Every structure is written in structure tokens, then in C-alpha cells.
């Protein structure tokens, strides 16, 4: 049943029950540029951001509060607009810029991209929440799930934990592959 393979809990339970080792890939940023975790949570660890977002994001009935949460995070940066930006045309989110223009990441004490994105010139910033190619919304909504799954015994999130657990969760970038897999 294909639908089951799209449910990480089922994959993890099945792998553990059958003694399998499994790698589960997620196509969104599992972290933010250096300095963000400490600024948001007081802890310089990606896991602290996952935990914080798990307490802030609501995502039920195909509705979520990602733009509200991004606006709330942006409000903790009095040095200027950002770091998050972009939202649907016609919507107003005070404190969440529509465009990247005017965001001074250096003044915020952050970088626009992670080290991982510097290796892929066409990669979008994890701060970009909306429009083609953006991954910011996927990260805001996916990281609470990563937090929940990381609490299951036998699950590790690489590279934040050693990949020697039976189930390893990792960030993947499928569009880097040119041909069929």
C-alpha cells in the first residue's frame, strides 16, 4: 500500500518490528543558518528550534499558522525586517515582508543561507516562505514532525545525531539529481 509508505510513523514501526535499517528523506531544510537557534530559543542547537516550532505551529484540517509563526519570529528581531519573508499576494502580514528587499541579514546576526546552500547556487533560502522553489514553509511545517519523530527510540536525525540508529531521518535534495533514479 503506497499510502502507508508516505506515513513516517508506519515506516518507523515496521522497520523496528522487522529489525530493518531505514533511511527516510525529507525534502526541506532541517535547520537554519548559524545563530538562529540561539537567538530564537537560547540554545545553539537545531533540536531546540524543532522543539520550539512543535509548540508554535498548528497544522490541522489542511490549515496552518505558518505565516503567523514567521511573523512572531520576525518580531524577535528588532534590528529590522526579517529573517522570514514572502507570503501570498493579496494577504497582509505586518512584520512579514512580501519581498526579500530591505532585509539585512548581517544586521540580524544571521546569514541568508546555510552552508549547505552555498554548494548549490540555485538553492532557495530557508527564510523564503512562498513562491516557486521556496522551502521555508515546508521547513516551518515539517520541523515539528521531525521533533516528534526524533523522540521515538531508535530514530536519529542526521547530521545532528550519529546515523547508527535503525531509523535515520535526513534532509534530501531530489532536484539535484538530473536523471531518473
List the predicted regions and their residue ranges.
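RNase H-like (RuvC/DEDD) metal-dependent nuclease/polynucleotide-processing core
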Residues: 2-23, 28-181
Amino acid at each position: 500500500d503506497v499510502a502507508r509508505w508516505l506515513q513516517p510513523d508506519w515506516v518507523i514501526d515496521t522497520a523496528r518490528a522487522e529489525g530493518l535499517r531505514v533511511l527516510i528523506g525529507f525534502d526541506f531544510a532541517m535547520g537554519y543558518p548559524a545563530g538562529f537557534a540561539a537567538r530564537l530559543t537560547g540554545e545553539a542547537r537545531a533540536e531546540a528550534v524543532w522543539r520550539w516550532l512543535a509548540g508554535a505551529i498548528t497544522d490541522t484540517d489542511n490549515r496552518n499558522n505558518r505565516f503567523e509563526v514567521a511573523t512572531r519570529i520576525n518580531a524577535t528581531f528588532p534590528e529590522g525586517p526579517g529573517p522570514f519573508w514572502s507570503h501570498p499576494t493579496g494577504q497582509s502580514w505586518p512584520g512579514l515582508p512580501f519581498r526579500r528587499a530591505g532585509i539585512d541579514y548581517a544586521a540580524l546576526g544571521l546569514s541568508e543561507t546555510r552552508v549547505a546552500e552555498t554548494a548549490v547556487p540555485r538553492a532557495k533560502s530557508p527564510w523564503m516562505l512562498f513562491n516557486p522553489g521556496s522551502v521555508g514553509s515546508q521547513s516551518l511545517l515539517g520541523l515539528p514532525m521531525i521533533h516528534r519523530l526524533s523522540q521515538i527510540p531508535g530514530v536519529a536525525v542526521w547530521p545532528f545525531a550519529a546515523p547508527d540508529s535503525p531509523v535515520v531521518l535526513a534532509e534530501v535534495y531530489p532536484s539535484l539529481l538530473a536523471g531518473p533514479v
